[in-house]
Design a protein with these regions (language model features):
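A glycine-rich helix N-cap at a beta->alpha junction
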Residues: 77-91
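Helix-rich, typically C-terminal accessory recognition domains appended to large enzymatic cores
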Residues: 378-414, 421-527, 633
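Beta-strand segments within the central parallel beta-sheet cores of soluble alpha/beta enzyme folds
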Residues: 319-323, 502-504, 600
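Intrinsic disorder at enzyme termini
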Residues: 501-575
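Structured secondary-structure scaffolds
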Residues: 2-48, 100-104, 147, 156, ...
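N-terminal catalytic cores of NTP/NDP-binding nucleotidyl/phosphoryl-transfer enzymes
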Residues: 2-75, 92-110, 114, 131, ...
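Cys/His-rich short segments
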Residues: 116-188
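Phosphate-backbone binding interfaces of nucleic-acid-interacting proteins
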Residues: 557-676
């Protein structure tokens, strides 16, 4: 096994914050592995960064009326801070809009281009003549041919889940202008993945059947069995890394071409800052490359990126790609579009100082081989029963008793059979983590805390102190060894708690191999610091507040307009029948003196001509209103406004920008026509 470890975590997409699904399925396991490998004495480079190109970012930018750069700048900072707050120990966290990344991506493309690794193909793609640009799949909307959903995209119908191509849509329209797009020829550069089928079969199917996860191996095997096809490595877009060819204006590198190259460019940035040679981590067979990803990225990291590196010719292949399945939330699929998620930055704000509780809860439910579920009640139980009741309880008992009986000094004792439990646990954790079995590794850690509690219950040092003080000393000496072992071993999983414990017991961090030796970890006479509670109980009302937050999200998702106000008190039909709504035309309009918001109208209701005062002057000038056909509540009791008797109410609604809009008939009709 190599001394050097190149560990990457999938680049989070900078069109929104990270949530617990991302954390459980990629970033916390990757961090545990990186921290563990450092403790094993390995030369580790743990690399990640924000993926800042692609269609979803441009779509969000258009929706928000800002530039794509504005979008990625905002979310890059939110994501980066979330990782820092949760103790994700990246050696480098960069971004794909960096100058270095553009240079490295373009150099990579040119090397393959000059090697003759691409094929040029001309295809027909939808083009928006008004916007003057080719449309990516997500910029084409229409009716789904499978379920008749009118809001299907060019790549997928989110209602029925069908995968689509733009030409399958019924009545396709451009999401940019609303116009019907035309098919237009365009040239792009394709990577003939079929050329690498034999290489991928030899490397993965024959070479990694026994040591790669079944979900990863099975998905790769399925892709290869179906036969690989050429895939475009360039796109007709104006946001991304420009294709570095003279005849490629208006084209950028495919986001899944440039994004994985980010691992390389970010490593180069890190190496330059730290006096390292980046090639030692990417072009040296004595380095183990490991990609941590979610299952939706398997094809990119096990087929496309390895094919790119093979074509380039100078890069090592991954030793492993431990892809995780998905984490659900309260028995429902996490969805960013539906806001059905627990966002990392929200958790940090709502649970200050409790980062390790989330790390522990997510690791213990990590979706290693199948989808798993997170619930707030389970989160509470894991904290209260396991972290407080078992782990924290043992640590506290040992520290308090040592201070009470021995003035904070480790009492005299000798290593006994119980010490073997420490070395056994350290070995178990190492073996589990080397196989990417994070849940089992965490269970071993907690089992050592359980063992410590059982040991204290059996020895009862609080009772033996009077009659057998030497027995009390021995039991608390052993208790201290177990407590220090927990402080050392919990660091990859719960780094904040480990830091507190190492300070509490006044010890330095050890290499992992030292924990596997059957020797004492702290000597008699060693002075420990004052104890403090490691974890605190989470009360029901705190959890209920989080559940209610999700319930509110669920209610909002039932609305077609999440910003709509709740329905008012229900009325019966007789009440409705009393309302007299009519069509009417505004004949005259003028501002009301000394009233910035009021306009005075003379309105032809078909029944009569009357005066109406309305507070809409901030949305309309008087001139805009004259001649407009509107709808009026005719039988509303008159009331005086600024001394003017208003005889009715005009119907208006509020647009997304906050401006008012008249409710009007589709076509001009007679005044006085009843509505209802």
């Amino acid at each position: 096994m190599s001394k050097r470890k190149m560990i990457t975590a999938a680049l989070p997409y900078a069109n929104g914050p990270v949530h617990i699904g991302h954390l459980a399925g990629v970033y916390i396991p990757a961090d545990v592995y990186a921290r563990f490998q450092r403790r094993m004495g390995k030369d580790v480079a743990f690399i990640c960064g924000s993926d800042e190109h692609g269609i979803p970012i441009t779509i969000r930018a258009k929706k928000e009326g800002v530039t794509p750069q504005d979008v990625v700048d905002k979310y890059h900072e939110i994501i980066k801070k979330s990782f820092e707050d949760l103790g994700i120990s990246f050696d480098e966290y960069s971004r794909t809009t960096s100058k270095k990344h553009y240079e490295v991506s373009q150099e990579f493309f040119l090397k393959m281009y000059h090697n003759g690794d691409f094929i040029e193909e001309v295809s027909e793609q939808y083009f928006d003549e008004q916007a003057g640009e080719f449309l990516a799949d997500r910029y084409i909307v229409g009716t789904c041919p499978k379920c008749s959903n009118d809001g299907a995209y060019g790549d997928q119908c989110e209602k029925c889940g069908s995968t689509l191509s733009p030409t399958e849509l019924i009545n396709p329209k451009s999401a940019l202008s609303g116009n019907v797009p035309v098919l237009k020829e365009t040239k792009n550069w394709y990577l003939p993945l079929n050329k690498y089928e034999n290489f991928l079969t030899e490397w993965i199917i024959k070479g990694h059947k026994d040591d790669w996860k079944p979900n990863v191996y099975g998905q790769v095997k399925s892709w290869l069995n179906d036969g690989l096809k050429p895939r475009a490595m360039t796109r007709d877009l104006n946001w991304g890394v420009p294709v570095p060819l003279l005849n490629a204006e208006g084209k950028v590198l495919y986001v899944w071409f440039d994004a994985p190259i980010g691992y390389i460019s970010f490593t180069q940035e890190w190496a330059e800052k730290n006096g390292k040679n980046w090639k030692d981590y990417w072009q040296n067979e004595n380095c183990d490359l490991v990609h941590f990803i979610g299952k939706d990225n398997i094809v990119f990291h096990c087929i496309i990126f390895p094919s790119m590196m093979k074509a380039h010719g100078e890069y090592i292949m991954p030793q492993n790609v431990p892809a995780f399945e998905f984490l659900n939330l309260e028995n429902d699929k996490i969805s960013t579009s539906r806001n059905w998620a627990v966002w990392a930055h929200d958790y940090v704000a709502d649970f200050p100082g409790q980062q390790d509780v989330l790390r522990y809860a997510l690791l213990s439910s990590a979706p290693e081989t199948k989808d798993n579920n997170f619930t707030w009640k389970d989160f509470q139980t894991k904290n209260n029963s396991e972290l407080v009741g078992i782990f924290g309880n043992f640590i506290n008992r040992v520290a308090v008793l040592i201070h009470k009986y021995y003035n904070g000094e480790i009492p005299q004792g000798t290593p006994s059979e119980e010490i073997k439990e420490i070395s056994k646990t350290a070995t178990e954790i190492r073996e589990f983590l080397e196989k990417y079995e994070f849940r089992n590794a965490l269970s071993s850690l907690m089992n050592l805390a359980r063992f410590g509690n059982q040991y204290l219950q059996t020895e009862e040092p609080w009772k033996t102190i009077k009659d057998s003080p030497e027995k009390t000393a021995q039991s608390l000496y052993i208790g201290a060894q177990i407590a220090v072992a927990l402080a050392q071993m919990c660091e990859p999983f719960m780094p904040f708690s480990s830091d507190k414990l190492l300070k509490m017991f006044n010890v330095e961090k050890l290499q992992w191999i030292d924990l596997e030796k059957e020797t004492e970890l702290v000597s008699a006479g060693h002075k420990i610091n004052e104890s403090s509670l490691l974890f605190s109980k989470i009360e029901d009302d705190v959890i209920e507040a989080q559940i209610q937050k999700l319930e509110q999200t669920k209610q909002n998702n039932k609305k077609t307009n999440p910003n709509a106000n709740p329905m008012k008190e229900q009325i019966n039909f007789d009440d409705f029948a009393k309302i007299d709504l009519r069509t009417a035309t505004i004949l005259e309009a003028e501002k009301v003196e000394k009233a910035d918001k009021l306009l005075k109208f003379k309105v032809d209701t078909g029944v009569d001509i009357r005066t109406v005062v309305s507070g809409i002057a901030e949305s309309f000038t008087p001139e805009e209103c004259i001649g407009k056909q509107v709808m009026i509540l005719l039988n509303l009791a008159p009331r005086k406004i600024r001394g003017i008797e208003s005889q009715g109410m005009l119907l208006l609604t509020t647009k997304p920008d906050g401006k008012l809009s008249f409710v009007t008939p589709d076509d001009k009709i007679e005044n006085g026509v009843e509505i209802g």
